[in-house]
Structures are given as structure tokens and as C-alpha cells.
Swiss-Prot record:
A motif ('KMSKS' region) lies at residues 375-379. Is required not only for elongation of protein synthesis but also for the initiation of all mRNA translation through initiator tRNA(fMet) aminoacylation. It catalyses: tRNA(Met) + L-methionine + ATP = L-methionyl-tRNA(Met) + AMP + diphosphate. ATP binds at K378. This is Methionine--tRNA ligase. It is found in: Cytoplasm. One of its GO terms (biological process) is methionyl-tRNA aminoacylation. Zn(2+) binds at C143, C146, C156, C159. The keyword RNA-binding applies. It holds the Pfam family tRNA_bind.
Length: 776
């Protein structure tokens, strides 16, 4: 029996966050680890979805190649998965795989040869300046409903109304700003309704396999599924195989068929007419939602031809998809329709997959993970973002445990820091961790590390032992149904019973080997079953218990190793620091950056503005040196952190040694009045914690106590002070400074310091004074 586990392909338009992990990748990872543990022949497949309009549009805006843009984020996504210990056998990308376009074209040509495509004429927006059709998202204009000036061609983001490009008032190209015209074009549509009977038969066969929601929703939606376009006028994507289409058409015409049999809008059978008709498709690409799921197959085949058996229908593989609940119809109707259609037509064309492809066995559509009940939003900085997950002092297995513990199959979940801390400290540390550590320590100290054997059983012994023996299959049955949370909670509940048993038996009084022997059976079982949830911690526990991580709960252990504490409680400080780092998504530098240098000479300010592709400081320094402008920072080696970062704008404030030949800076950089100065609320504080900034080599994240509250600051002190030199110092800070994002971390104030261009010295009270005292 072969099991192929897949997780939804993340779109490589940005990093993934904790909601993505909880919705597909962690449940799939846990499921995969369990089936491997059980001894099944299994693969876990994933990769980035790298084509489509959003990627193309963003790349154009940044003046970079779409492939570079998509590859950049694919690497970031893969790194985040690695940090979260998501163990794929293969992680690829639709634009990285050499075989992917070949298999995608095979699917397309199979549908074409089977008569499952329909040609339709549409009138779509066109940019005459660059001579290309525009996807809906490439068109902007005034919303006809609310008047918003920057509504997209598919939706107004202000009022939320769904739109058509033609509805916009004064529609313009998002690429050039040119007024768009509407021009006729032809596209091919997948005739899904033609396969309705076969799809209904397939869905009905899953009545006892899929959960009730997935089954009933898919069946209800089937009647409303219409033809869907599978070609687009984009540049970025898998090219439509127009030449092969024409060859299939010519061959079929010789067999007595007509263009109408292929759904084409042409009556002529003249070879030249057909060539001209099909030629239009040479400049089109296949729709991203058509090519993306085929990536499951492409990525499997990247490793070795033997992996074909995970897709060959004759082999009866178990193909299991993990996705978000919004993706259910796509995987229960559209994707099976593609497979059915491909199987009907592939023998009529040149193909590399010489077998019928198996339909999905199981589709797990998981609920969403919200953040305090609300949807994740990068722009609003609302959620838990994973770019810097390795920069915090919390073990990844703690996040894995918590997300699995709160997992449900019926309603949306919510990540909350207080609950996270409570679940870890109560269930993982105090319950499971404490029980395992107590038993192992007891064996090591009282029995010289040699686990005793079971001699006799009383009723309490039998009760616990029976539950322990039944636990593996109970847990696996939950896992097989995609009920990850129920599986883990079953382990937690059984651990509670084991703790109660241990307390009631009081082996520290009796030194009863029988009690310890039964408790050790529980320990071995817990460790093995916890491995898919918390693999690194489970491996540590297994090394102490001297057992192998395998589906064998009766392993004989001659002697255990010296125990050590594996689980530690989470502190408030750990939570606060993690919250600061993980609720601030990292900003990535793609494309041009705006750099502003503000130079002060005597009482005047001057500025220079640049657009740079490389390091902002290097770019500014290069231009200042080129203009022979003398400034104090010319003695500083290496990168200099900007004083202000605002999106993709970097501002440097530099003292000039002579009057620079630059334009005067605007008033916002100029002198302030006494009344403006009086607005500053300066207070005495004490530095209580210092951490390295995860996104900047020369910045610290500094915790300052004001007595009745604490503040988090970001300061460029790393080259002037060691961490230990700062902790405990009394300092002066601006308390009412507007919070500012500095390289992804919110700074809630500013420390006062003197700077002569070579050295920096913090301003500190010269004698003891109460924390929070006002500086006047």
C-alpha cells in the first residue's frame, strides 16, 4: 500500500505565516510521520505555486524578472518549512521543475484531444502602449459604487464589491498608466459539465471516506460548476502548446472530424485558416489554477521514475490532500475533473505518463487559524509571522504541540499567546513532561537505570495498562480521519490518567517495581506517539529511555540513560519577546529602494534623494563620495543602519564637515520650537533585557523598565556596547515617541545618547533616582 501525502502549494508571492502552517502543512506533516511510523510506504510532496498574475504584476512593478521574484519567495517559503520541521520528501516549484511544463502540456493536449475544451470569444482590457492584454488585477480605475480611485478590475478593496474591468470609470493599465481599450480575444475553457456524471459517481464513492461537510458541500456544488477558462493572455506561465494542438487537429480532420468536435470557433477545414486560427494561442499561457495541482504529479516524478506508482491507478495508491477549507471544491471537483479528462484523452497524443492517473482518495479541508479571532493580515501586522521563527527563545516543538492540540475539523481555530503559554505549561510540561521525567528519574535513581518487569496486576494496574495498550490504535484511527487534535488530546488525557495512577500508587513510599514497570510502558508509548507531533523533543526522550522511534510499543530496554529535563515552562518574558518578533513580518528588499541623506551643517539641513538597487548605505555613501561631500560618517567602516525606515524608504541623518552643495531639506527635518520640544516626555528608565535584532547586525532589541511599565526599544548600540554592559544601566528615553517599525520590530521610544561620529555614549543620571522620573 502506497500513500501519497500532499499539502496545498503555497503561492510564491510572499512568506507563509502560522495560519498557513496550521491549515495544511503541519496536519499533513503529522499525518505523514504517523503513516511512516506505522510502516507504510509513503511520500510527502509539496512545492511553490509560481505562476499567475499577482507574481507577474509585482515583478513588473519592481522591474525584475517574474522567475526571480517567484524563486526568491519559494526559497523563503522552503526555509520557513525547514525551520518548522516540516519534513517533505520533495519541495519544488512549478517554475523550477523541468518536467512540470511537459506534464502540464500533456494534460492540456489530452483534454483537447478528448473534446473537453470549448473556445469562447471575450472582450478584455488591452494596454496599447505595451501591446498586451491585461488580467483584471492589472486594471485600475474609479469604483462605480463608492468612487474609490484605485479600484482593481476584479474588486474594489474599499467597498468590497466584485467588479468587471468594464465597470470601472476611466480604467487604466496598472503597468503603464495608459488608458485601456477593450479588445476581442479568444480563450479555451474546460467543459467540466460534460464530466458531471463521472464526477458525481466519484464523489458519491467517497460518502464513507470524506467527512460529512466535504462530501455534502462537494455534491451540492457540482450542479453549479460551469466551464472555466484555462488560457490567459499573460506572459508569465506555461505556454499553450499551439503547435501540438494544430498537429492533433490536422490528424483528426483526416479521420473525418471537424474543428467543432474540438470546441473551436472556426468552420473552415482549410489548413492555412486553421494555422492562422491556432497561431493566436502561441502568445498565451495556461491559467495558474490549471497548472498548479498538476505540480503534485510533476514534483513526485522529479525524484525517480519509480515514484510513478504513487499515481498509477492500477497500483491503487492512497492519495491524500491537505488543504484549507476554501480549497475543498477545487480538490474534490476541478482537480478530479482534470484527471478524469486527462485519462480519457492521453492515449490519443504523445505522452510520458503511460498509465491512468489515480483519483484522490482523501481530501482534508482544514479550518482556518485566526489570530485572536480575526483573520491574519500582513498589512495590518495582525498574526504570527514566521520569517524570524528561529530568532526566538521558544522551541519549535512547542508551536507544533499547541497547533495540534487546538486543531479541529469543524470550526476555525484561534492563536492566542496566553492560551499558548497555558497549554504548553499545563499539558506538555506539567502533565506529559512531568510524568515522563518522574518515571525515568525514578528508574535511574531507584533501580540503577534498569526498568523493572511487570510481576502482577491489580485492578488499577490493569485499567491503566489496558488504556496504554489501546492508545496507539485509537490515536492512529483519529489520524487516519484527519482528526489531528483529537489524536493529541487522547494522548494528553491518557497521560493525565497515568499521572493520577502514579500519585495514587505512591511508589516513592513503597518502591514498588510493578508500578514503575507499568508506568514505563506508558512512557515508551507516549514517546513514540508524540514523535509525529514534537519530533525533536521525542527523539531526546527516546535517547533517555533507550528506545527506537518505531511502531513497536513492547521494546525491551536493558538500561536507560541518565535523565535530564527536556521540557521547560514558558515565561512571560519569552512570550513577550516572541510576540514582538513574530507579530512583525519581515520586510524583504526586492527592486529599488528610496534613500534620503539629510546632512546638517551649522544650523541648516540639506538633503539628497536616490533610488538604489543595492545596500542603501553603500548606495548613499557612494554618491556622497562621488560628489566629494565631507561628513563625519566617512570614517565608519561597513554598513550603517538608517535612522528611519519607512517601508522601502531609508533615511540617514549625517553631520556635514562643510557646507554641502545640495538642496535644502524640507521643514520636517529643520529646527523645532520650544513648544515642540516641550512635547517630548523624557523619563529615566532601567535596561532589564537586551537581545540581538533578528534582521539587523548592528541593532539591539532593548527592554527598559520605567517602574510601573516596560518599553521595547530598538537601538543601534551593538558596535558600542556589549549586552552585559547595557543590562542594569539607568538611561534616559523619550517616552512619548510615536512607535516605529525598525527592521520589522516595533520601537516604542528612543534612548538619548551623544555621538561624535566615532563613539556613542548613553546619557545616564549621575546619581540614583526613581524609575520613571521626568527629565526636564
Amino acid at each position: 500500500m502506497r500513500i501519497l501525502v500532499t499539502a496545498a502549494l503555497p503561492y510564491s508571492n510572499g512568506p507563509i505565516h502560522l495560519g498557513h502552517i496550521a491549515g495544511a502543512y503541519l496536519p499533513a506533516d503529522i499525518f505523514y510521520r504517523f503513516v511512516k511510523l506505522k510502516g507504510y510506504n509513503a511520500l510527502y510532496i509539496c512545492g511553490s505555486d509560481q505562476y499567475g498574475s499577482p507574481i507577474e504584476l509585482n515583478a513588473i512593478k519592481l522591474n525584475i524578472d517574474p522567475k526571480d521574484y517567484a524563486s526568491f519567495y519559494r526559497k523563503i517559503q522552503e526555509e520557513i518549512f525547514k525551520k518548522f520541521n516540516i519534513k517533505f520528501d520533495i519541495y519544488s516549484g512549478t517554475a523550477e521543475s523541468n518536467i512540470h511544463p511537459i506534464i502540464v502540456k500533456e494534460f492540456f493536449l489530452s483534454l483537447f484531444s478528448a473534446g473537453l475544451l470549448i473556445e469562447k470569444e471575450q472582450e478584455l482590457p488591452y494596454d496599447p502602449k505595451i501591446k498586451r492584454f491585461l488580467p483584471d488585477r492589472f486594471v485600475v480605475g474609479q469604483c462605480p459604487y463608492c468612487g474609490y480611485e484605485k479600484a482593481y478590475g476584479d474588486q474594489c478593496e474599499k467597498c468590497g464589491r466584485l467588479l468587471e474591468p468594464k465597470e470601472l470609470i476611466n480604467p487604466k493599465s496598472a503597468i503603464t498608466g495608459e488608458k485601456v481599450i477593450f479588445k476581442k480575444t479568444r480563450h479555451l475553457f474546460f467543459n467540466i459539465p460534460k464530466l458531471k456524471d463521472k464526477l458525481k459517481q466519484y464523489i458519491e464513492s467517497k460518502k464513507d471516506v470524506w467527512n460529512d461537510f466535504t462530501y455534502s458541500w462537494s455534491l451540492a456544488l457540482l450542479d453549479n460548476f460551469k466551464e472555466r477558462a484555462i488560457t490567459r493572455d499573460n506572459k508569465w506561465g506555461v505556454k499553450v502548446p499551439a503547435k501540438e494542438m494544430l498537429e492533433i487537429l490536422k490528424k483528426a480532420l483526416k479521420e473525418g472530424k471537424t474543428p467543432k468536435d474540438f470546441g473551436l470557433l472556426i468552420d473552415s477545414t482549410n489548413e492555412k485558416d486553421l494555422e492562422n486560427h491556432i497561431k493566436e494561442y502561441e502568445n498565451k499561457v495556461l491559467y495558474v489554477w490549471f497548472d498548479a495541482p498538476i505540480g503534485y504529479i510533476s514534483f513526485t516524478f522529479e525524484t525517480s521514475p519509480e515514484y510513478r506508482y504513487y499515481w498509477d491507478e492500477k497500483e491503487k495508491p492512497y492519495i491524500v490532500h491537505f488543504i484549507g477549507k476554501d480549497n475543498i471544491p477545487f480538490h474534490t471537483i476541478f482537480w478530479p475533473a482534470l484527471i478524469i479528462g486527462r485519462n480519457l484523452g492521453y492515449k490519443n497524443i504523445n505522452h510520458i505518463l503511460d498509465f491512468d492517473i489515480a483519483l484522490p482518495y482523501q481530501v482534508f479541508g482544514n479550518p482556518y487559524l485566526n489570530y485572536y479571532g480575526k483573520k491574519f493580515s500582513k498589512s495590518k501586522r495582525w498574526g504570527v509571522f514566521l520569517d524570524n521563527i528561529d530568532k526566538i527563545d521558544i522551541d519549535i516543538d512547542y508551536f507544533r504541540f499547541y497547533l495540534a492540540y487546538i486543531h479541529t475539523v469543524s470550526k476555525d481555530m484561534s492563536f492566542e499567546w496566553d492560551q499558548f503559554k497555558e497549554v504548553i505549561n499545563k499539558e506538555l510540561v506539567d502533565n506529559i513532561g512531568n510524568f515522563i521525567h518522574r518515571v525515568l528519574t525514578f528508574i535511574y535513581n531507584r533501580f540503577n537505570g534498569i526498568p523493572p518487569k511487570i510481576e502482577h496486576l491489580d485492578d488499577k494496574d490493569k485499567e491503566l495498562l489496558d488504556k496504554i495498550k489501546q492508545l496507539p490504535e485509537k490515536v492512529f484511527n483519529f489520524i487516519w480521519k484527519g482528526e489531528i487534535g483529537n489524536a493529541l488530546r487522547e494522548i494528553v488525557n491518557t497521560s493525565n490518567l497515568a499521572n493520577k495512577y502514579f500519585q495514587e500508587k505512591e511508589p516513592w513510599k513503597t518502591n514498588d517495581p510493578n508500578t514503575i514497570a507499568i508506568a514505563f510502558e506508558a512512557v515508551k508509548t507516549f514517546i513514540i506517539l508524540l514523535y509525529p507531533f514534537i519530533p525533536e523533543k521525542a527523539k531526546l526522550l527516546a535517547s533517555i529511555a533507550n528506545i527506537d522511534i518505531k511502531w513497536d510499543f513492547n521494546q525491551k530496554v536493558e538500561k536507560i540513560n541518565k535523565p535530564f529535563i527536556v521540557f521547560h515552562k514558558l515565561s512571560d518574558n519569552q512570550i513577550e519577546m516572541a510576540k514582538q518578533i513574530l507579530t512583525n513580518p519581515k520586510e524583504y528588499d526586492l527592486g529599488k529602494k528610496k534613500v534620503i541623506g539629510v546632512l546638517r551643517y551649522e544650523d541648516e539641513l540639506y538633503k539628497i534623494e536616490l533610488e538604489c538597487d543595492d545596500n542603501p548605505w553603500v548606495c548613499l555613501k557612494r554618491e556622497l563620495d562621488k560628489r566629494k561631500i565631507k561628513y563625519i560618517y566617512d570614517t565608519v567602516k561597513g554598513d550603517v543602519p538608517p535612522h528611519i525606515i519607512d517601508g522601502n524608504t531609508y533615511i540617514y541623518l549625517l553631520p556635514a564637515l562643510e557646507k554641502p552643495n545640495l538642496e535644502k531639506a524640507e521643514e520636517e527635518y529643520g529646527l523645532v520650537s520650544y513648544l515642540d520640544f516641550a512635547k517630548l516626555d523624557m523619563r529615566v528608565g532601567k535596561i532589564i533585557d537586551v537581545q540581538d535584532h533578528p534582521n539587523a547586525d548592528k541593532l539591539y532589541i532593548i527592554k527598559v523598565s520605567l517602574g510601573n511599565k516596560q518599553k521595547t526599544l530598538v537601538g543601534g548600540l551593538k558596535q558600542y556596547y556589549k549586552k552585559e554592559e547595557l543590562i542594569g544601566k539607568y538611561v534616559v528615553l523619550i517616552n512619548n515617541l510615536k512607535p516605529k517599525q525598525l527592521r520589522g520590530i516595533t520601537s516604542e521610544g528612543m534612548l538619548l545618547a551623544a555621538d561624535d561620529g566615532k563613539e556613542v555614549a548613553l546619557l545616564m543620571p549621575d546619581k540614583p533616582i526613581s524609575l520613571g522620573s521626568k527629565v526636564r
